[in-house]
């Protein structure tokens, strides 16, 4: 059984738990709410990977953050790479495998953003924006995966 975003009850519960970490009591507003959303998923996922790379450059490097940075960049850029692979899949099975990986990597990206905020709390506002994008990508891939 799935909710309106195509998530199972356990996924939805996990998403709500994730959101509580980010809730600082203030209403959150996107930096540019008037900007047009990108509906080309290949472009959107590539832009997401690029934004994560730019964010990672601002993270101070130390023994703790170095490992998280590597994991974060790997997970976030894998979302777009696997979407591109799914787009060129030669079989339904290959397509579903790649889309399933996109889902997992989007969720993993949210996790590593949370860990970066724990290690470098002053980066929370920038990490929050990226976390929201990862949160939006996950149900998109869930719906694609379930409907194919």
Predicted regions and their residues:
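Amphipathic alpha-helical assembly/interaction segments
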Residues: 1-148
């Amino acid at each position: 059984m799935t909710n309106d975003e195509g998530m199972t009850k356990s996924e939805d519960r996990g998403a709500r738990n994730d959101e509580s970490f980010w809730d600082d009591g203030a209403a959150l507003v996107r930096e540019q709410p008037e900007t047009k959303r990108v509906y080309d998923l290949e472009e959107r996922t590539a832009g997401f990977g690029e934004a994560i790379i730019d964010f990672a450059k601002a993270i101070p490097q130390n023994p703790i953050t170095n490992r998280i940075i590597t994991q974060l960049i790997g997970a976030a850029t894998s979302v777009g790479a696997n979407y591109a692979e799914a787009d060129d899949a030669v079989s339904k099975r290959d397509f579903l495998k790649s889309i399933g990986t996109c889902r997992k990597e989007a969720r993993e990206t949210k996790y590593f953003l949370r860990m970066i905020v724990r290690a470098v709390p002053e980066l929370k506002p920038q990490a929050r924006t990226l976390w929201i994008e990862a949160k939006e990508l996950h149900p998109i891939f869930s719906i694609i995966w379930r409907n194919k």
